[in-house]
Amino acid sequence: MPTLKDVAALAGVSAATVSLYLNGKAAGRISSQKQKEIEEALQQLSYQPTPAARELKRLKNIPRVYTVAVYWAADPRSALLSKVMTGIQASLAKKPDIPFNVVICPYQPNELYKQKGLIEPHLYNYDASIIANTSMMDMEYLDSIKPNIPVVLLNRRLEQYSYVSINNQKMGAALADMIADRGFKRVAVFRTQSPYLAVNDRVTGFISGCRSKGVDMPNHALFYTDNSTDGGIQAARDFLKLEERPDVVFCDSDAIALGALYAFYQAGVRIPKDLSVISIGLHHSSTSKCSIPPLTVSEVPLTQMAEGCMDYVIRALTDKSYAADPEPVHVELETKIIVRESFQ
């Protein structure tokens, strides 16, 4: 059976030139005369590519499929994963000609170090990673390693990594400014006993902002509860036991706020006439705007952050000029307060 080298020898060209011709890459590289001579040699020798060569040619014509690992903590925040996927899909829709696989990699909080795909991505065919929901311990781990694939952090910050985030303390402080501007003097806080960095930053920003604006938050008006509607119900019931109640309640999640609104309604508290309620908005806005009354929130743009992360991944994997000299990309998105009937 004639080989590629036999064809090359008969045509008076190199084996590489014959390979280019067979793979349809002769245009601009091989003269018309040489192409004719190669074709004549192929016919004269009755050359047939080997099965392996045919398979290689077939594979070369298949577009490369990139695989992106999304690391998401396996805890109550899993309910927010749909917003992240919506953002990733929005990014992918901008580049429909580039195929991607997205793999969800759940990990236990504080145990990101167990995810071998970050340090040995070739074992899992990962081309890039998006990392979300990291704890302080997880951040320390990330600070100690140097992944050899593009990595972007979602709502977390390390200077050596690319990230798309918001200023969580600024977000909390903006709500404090709104309270002070409306003339409120005392506030209660319903919050989770949270190990989550972003949640703690938002609450810290809110409390610090209140203090700087002269809005009092008495110690007895700080209620720790579960991050759920049941947690909000319990916090509201404890709040109603106070002899002197603040005029406004801040909740560090809309799940807590929705439970609180229900408990206040059951107790005959008129919102916002008797009490105003504001919250951080984590879930879909359709949830908070359909509460009774509709809830005032400062929305965490989770979908937009996820879209920005995926935009970065696509660029890092497909933009050859960037891939040749990559620098961390740091993006900070703005947040907005949506004032609804729960606050006046």
Give the ranges of each region predicted by the language model.
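Alpha-helical recognition/docking segments in bacterial nutrient-uptake
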Residues: I62-D177, D181, L240-K241, P294-E299
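Short acidic capping loops at alpha-helix termini that bridge into adjacent secondary structure
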Residues: R186, M217-A221, I271-V277
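Flexible loop/turn connectors
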Residues: R237-Q344
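Hinge/beta->alpha junction and helix N-cap segments in small-molecule ligand-binding domains
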Residues: A73-K83, V103-Y113, V164-A174, F190-R237, ...
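N-terminal helix-turn-helix DNA-binding module of bacterial transcription factors
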Residues: M1-K57
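Short beta-strand segments enriched in small/hydrophobic residues
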Residues: A15-S19, K57-R77, M178, R186-Q193
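Periplasmic-binding protein-like
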Residues: A69, L123-N133, A188-R191, E243-I256, ...
